[in-house]
């Protein structure tokens, strides 16, 4: 009985399992047929069956995948005013700036997203800029020394700390440099071993001329009092020709736009914070000369341009705001002889309102071992007064009674007028000898070993050129 019951139970249990398998198979076949019918019904969107089906089952909810829109870069062309302080206005005609080549966006600056066509020689063909492109630099963003501007009437009573970059005016020459030709491929290395430099052998320092000079009455320097002056490798003497102040008749012609002495007269006083600035130079050593000579760079010792100069003594690349510029340099006549002689009796300090990226590299080329110029100060060491850079000599940390500054812009030493010696701006004159004219006077100041300010004031009389109250 038990065996039969077990067999019967096994047979009974087998039947429903078989039915279940058949049911599952039929169900899968039905699903397959339904899916096939669904596919066919989806193909034909019209008909009574599709209508009934949609009515019974309902419309399937389509889940749309939220995919972000395809990114596209804004075609914002490059601004050509990368070294000038005056941005191009929107109403000016657009033009290409073929002498710039980009390396990549810096500090969030936008660049064109389109691939720039490459010429067969490997140079980039820069597209014409649009007037709506935003300016990438401020009005003070030049690599060369900017031109001074008058104080606005609303800010005449402002202090020296109230600087306004909007009042800085760029030099006309720098603005002209926007019309640049195609930039030649130049290495981006900043080494000073001469591989990036191009020297003109015809422009080597010439020997000093032997000039018979006469001593004017009333000078503190006489030929008999002067020691023999010979530059290294030269047997010629410097002439003792005093620099003459500009004549009143031609003064207005030279300064049609800007009067440096009117600027000096109305310059605001230094703030307490500026007066207590930490000295930028290290303390003197035993080998340091007792007297300090501060020299300007642009138009005082050299003349630099972004336009190609055929008579350039050297040329070198400068990377400024992601753009490589080729700088062409002219050296003022007797530039090296002057430095070689003065460095023996003065602590030579270069103080320029130019950008460090340009001035420091130029000095590395001209004086790589710092044998002539002991210290270098740049724009960041100047005092910015309403957009104008003034060289406050207090930042040197030196005794001002034994400090002399030579600059082609008298307003640059507006706060220490009695320490300043003006010199004529130099651009191209090969017969210039203004540096030679200053040598006897500078040597005499060291020989006297007294306060230099009364002698400078008596010799150049810059205070007499200030406008009356």
From Swiss-Prot:
Residues 28-42 have a biased composition (Basic and acidic residues). Residues 10-20, 79-91 have a biased composition (Polar residues). Residues 286-445 form the FCP1 homology domain. Coiled coil: none annotated. Residues 1-42, 73-136, 181-209, 231-250 are annotated as: Disordered. Keywords: Hydrolase, Protein phosphatase. GO terms for molecular function: phosphoprotein phosphatase activity. PROSITE patterns: FCP1. Pfam families: NIF (PF03031). SMART domains: CPDc. SUPFAM superfamilies: HAD-like (SSF56784). Its EC number is 3.1.3.-. It comes from the Eukaryota. PANTHER family: DULLARD PROTEIN PHOSPHATASE. Belongs to the CTDSPL2 family. Probable phosphatase. This is CTD small phosphatase-like protein 2-A. It comes from Danio rerio. The lineage of its organism: Eukaryota, Metazoa, Chordata, Craniata, Vertebrata.
